[in-house]
Amino acid sequence: MAPKTTLIAEPELVSKSVNTIRFLAIDAVEKAKSGHPGMPMGCAPMGHVLYDEFMRFNPKNPYWFNRDRFVLSAGHGCMLQYALLHLSGYDSVKEEDLKSLRQWGSRTPAHPENFETPGVEVTTGPLGQGIASAVGLAVAEKHLAARYNKPGFEIVDHYTYVILGDGCQMEGVSNEACSLAAHWGLGKLIALYDDNHITIDGDTDVAFTEDVDKRFDALGWHVIWVKNGNDGCDEIRAAIEEAKSVKDRPTMIKVTTTIGYGAPSKANTYGVHGNALGPKEAEATRKNLGWPYEPFHVPDDVKKHWSRHIAEGAALESAWNAKFAEFQKKFPEEAADLKSIITGELPTNWESIFPTYTPENPGLPTRTLSHQILNGLGDVLPGLLGGSADLTLSNMAFLKNSGDFQKKSPGERNVKFGAREHAMGSICNGLALHSPGLLPYCATYFVFTDYMRAAMRISALSKARVLYIMTHDSIGLGEDGPTHQPVEHLASFRAMPNILTLRPADGNETAGAYRAAVQNGERPSILVLARQKLPQLPGTSIEGVSKGGYVISDNSRGGNSKPDVILIGTGSELEIAARAGDELRKEGKKVRVVSLVCWELFAEQSEKYRETVLPSGVTARVSVEAGSTFGWERFIGPKGKAVGIDRFGASAPAERLFKEFGITVEAVVAAAKEIC
């Protein structure tokens, strides 16, 4: 792609532009009476050089596919990004938006949120998440470029820029992700490290004395040090130009800055990190930096200089659209695939890949069924890619017809994350938020979601369609014992907003779970899968899963009859509920068996539908699930019984564990007899 037409302002105008950014941050935080002014004040030169001189974007179409991506990993410094979006001409950040920083219903929340503010690529705030998500954005660019670019057609060609701080560097997720970034040779990932040596607890000397340069050199990054980040725009510019010349590895530019630069008494102190300057210090800063303007004022010459980005951005997108039109004519199949990734449009008849299972089919673990369906989807969804945290064969989460995404084979679709669960989740967030039609999946044992929960929460908050394939879902994994046996995990994820927790029982339900995950484009999904072999049950269906809960058998239907008891199960325990129902029916009981495969989807159904599944007139209800009983009272009511596990597991064969913990047909039958 041709370089951006760069108009470097005269030094005096550059200085005025940088101070405009600083004072927009100061003024917004003052008005909000809370916030983080120090980081934007110190990083304003970085922001100016990046947005004004290097980044390619169209302010009037924040979602133009081939734009450069920017991630503010130090998300508390959000006013840096909001000021840059405002100056660049984004409609999402007008003056009134700056004035409503951190207020109810504003487009300028306390930390950048991709779903609130067009121009923000990923949600940041928890330190380290931003740089890790940025690795995902850079993976997306490298992968799509390898698959779709042709000689003369560099359709996918953009950079990912990040600003991160000392806190991000301390978080383990950043090191996990940066290790992978170097391993994969992400040459279009450029990170600028705000080296200001201040944390909330004081100087970084209290807890952070490592040599960051040497660490990143050891990881395999190209490292540059800009010693004067306070007003050294020329040095920052030269560093970014050098970084762009390095094609085979990511670059970390350490930029030494002064937090709160320009504030006479608060600069270089932790007091300017997370507090407004206060009226006196704000006024003193105006005098110190020679800023005579009223709050929120953008000088005319600064406004005029930045206004060119609107026309330049439109021209960049127009040129790309023309090139893509040529690409479509010459490479129609590749263009169609790429267009589906850009738009998120699902191909016609994509659901035809889902098999239908009957009780005559052999029983299989749901992780094996997942593998079959995942590969079927891989054949029809060009944006599907992902992998496992060093458990590929155990999770069975790989595409048979693809090789491994590596530095020298970036067009392949199997991603080996190594034992880095946290970074895996964050990288998948970046992949999902790069393009609507990218569908990243990642896999590990369900219990190890403890290592990646922060990333999964960001998935849910960001409306990122990430597919979490979580196997070994209960004591059913057997001898590995309580460290590997999830107990509380289902309950914890069911409590998390905007994420689907799907625990299928057999082939039909596994297919239904994948269908729901693909169709829900604005939330992640967790497929909770069993290691042990499970039968194909009568009465299960793909369509039933879409409703979250449904009846798989009932011998009371007809006339005004109603069941004596309702048995509710999920996953591997749905078979136990079904068999318990058969036993009770032999004794003359009218029994309904319900699969509650996804609580979230069931809660979204109409009250009328939910009543057809769990009629309020039937209070005798028993749930069975090999996990915590927490939350089941919502469905079984005050008169119901919950069969589950409210302690940690143990090391023994699975069959013995189910017996010892009372997750059996006999236990369900006994519980039912107590209440009906």
Swiss-Prot record:
Enzyme class, UniProt record, top EC level: transferase
List of residues binding thiamine diphosphate: H76, G125, P126, L127, G167, N196, H273, E421, F448
Co-factor binding comment: Binds 1 Mg(2+) ion per subunit. Can also utilize other divalent metal cations, such as Ca(2+), Mn(2+) and Co(2+). Binds 1 thiamine pyrophosphate per subunit.
Entry-linked InterPro entries: THDP-binding, Transketo_C/PFOR_II, Transketolase-like_C_2, Transketolase-like_Pyr-bd, Transketolase_bac-like, Transketolase_BS, Transketolase_CS, Transketolase_fam
Keywords of the record: Calcium, Magnesium, Metal-binding, Thiamine pyrophosphate, Transferase
Keyword Magnesium: yes
Residues of the site described as Important for catalytic activity: H36, H273
Quaternary structure annotation from Swiss-Prot or TrEMBL: Homodimer.
Protein name (record): Transketolase 7
Name of the encoding gene: TKT7
